[in-house]
C-alpha cells in the first residue's frame, strides 16, 4: 500500500513521499516538529509524544485510497475537494501541495500549509489524550484545532463568517452549530476561545483529558443555556476578533 513511497526520517517524524514532492518534505517535517513541541507544552505532556508518520500523497485517488485502507476512515469516494488532510492515531495523510491546483479547492501557501499541519497535529494530540475521542463534539475538536493553530487570525474561511454574524446580530445557537459541519469550523473556535479566556487553559486541558461522554458543559459546570448566553455576549464585545479583520 505504501511500499512504493520514499521515506524521510528525523527524530520522531517519518514522512512518506514520491520524488516529485520531495521539495515539500522539509517544511512538512519542520512544521510537525514545531507543532509537537508547542502543543506538547500546551497540553502539559509528561512524556515524549509517540512518533508521527505523515504521507504526502500525489493525487485525490491516492488520498482516498490511503484514508480508507490505511487509516480505516470511511469517507465518500471521490472525496470532497476541500479534504486535504486526515489524521488517525499517529498517522497523517496529506494531499501534497503539488496536487492542490487539480485536486482541491485550495491554492498552496507556505504559511497556510504550516497552519494546516498545526491544525492536524492538534487533532492527533487530542485523540492521544482523550478518554473517548469518538464522543467529542465536532465543534469542540475543530474549534480547538482552529483556535490553537491560529487559523482564525489569518484565514477568511474561519473569521469572516463570525464577523458577519456579530455585525448582523445573527450568531447561531450551539445546538445549531453542532448539527452543521460548516458552522463547527466557523464558530467552534470562538467557543474554545471563550472557554480559555473565561476559565483558563486548565479548563481546556480538563475537557480534553476528562470529557468521556461529550458533555463539555458538564465539565465546565454550566448549563448550555447559561453558557450560550455568556458566550454570545462575549463575542459581541471581543475586540481581538475585529483586530485581525
Region spans (language model):
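Acidic/His/Gly-enriched intrinsically disordered linker/tail segments
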Residues: 84, 112-116, 128-245
Amino acid at each position: 500500500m505504501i511500499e512504493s513511497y520514499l521515506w524521510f526520517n528525523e527524530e520522531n517524524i517519518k514522512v512518506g513521499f514520491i520524488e516529485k514532492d520531495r521539495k515539500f518534505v522539509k517544511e512538512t517535517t519542520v512544521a510537525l516538529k514545531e507543532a509537537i513541541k508547542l502543543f506538547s507544552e500546551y497540553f502539559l505532556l509528561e512524556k515524549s509524544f509517540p512518533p508521527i508518520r505523515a504521507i504526502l500523497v500525489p493525487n485525490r485517488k491516492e488520498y482516498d485510497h490511503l484514508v480508507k485502507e490505511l487509516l480505516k476512515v470511511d469517507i465518500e469516494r471521490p472525496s470532497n475537494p476541500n479534504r486535504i488532510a486526515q489524521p488517525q492515531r499517529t498517522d497523517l495523510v496529506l494531499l501534497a501541495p503539488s496536487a492542490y491546483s487539480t485536486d482541491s479547492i485550495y491554492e498552496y501557501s507556505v504559511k497556510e500549509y504550516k497552519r494546516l499541519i498545526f491544525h492536524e497535529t492538534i487533532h492527533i494530540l487530542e485523540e492521544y489524550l482523550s478518554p473517548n475521542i469518538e464522543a467529542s463534539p465536532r465543534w469542540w475538536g475543530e474549534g480547538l484545532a482552529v483556535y490553537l493553530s491560529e487559523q482564525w487570525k489569518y484565514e477568511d474561511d474561519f473569521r469572516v463568517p463570525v464577523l458577519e454574524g456579530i455585525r448582523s446580530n445573527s450568531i447561531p445557537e450551539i445546538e445549531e452549530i453542532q448539527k452543521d459541519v460548516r458552522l463547527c469550523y466557523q464558530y467552534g473556535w470562538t467557543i474554545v476561545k471563550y472557554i480559555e479566556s473565561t476559565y483558563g487553559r486548565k479548563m481546556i486541558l480538563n475537557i480534553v483529558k476528562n470529557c468521556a461522554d461529550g458533555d463539555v458543559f458538564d465539565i465546565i459546570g454550566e448549563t448550555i443555556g447559561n453558557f450560550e448566553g455568556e458566550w454570545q455576549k462575549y463575542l459581541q464585545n471581543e475586540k481581538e476578533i475585529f483586530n485581525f479583520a
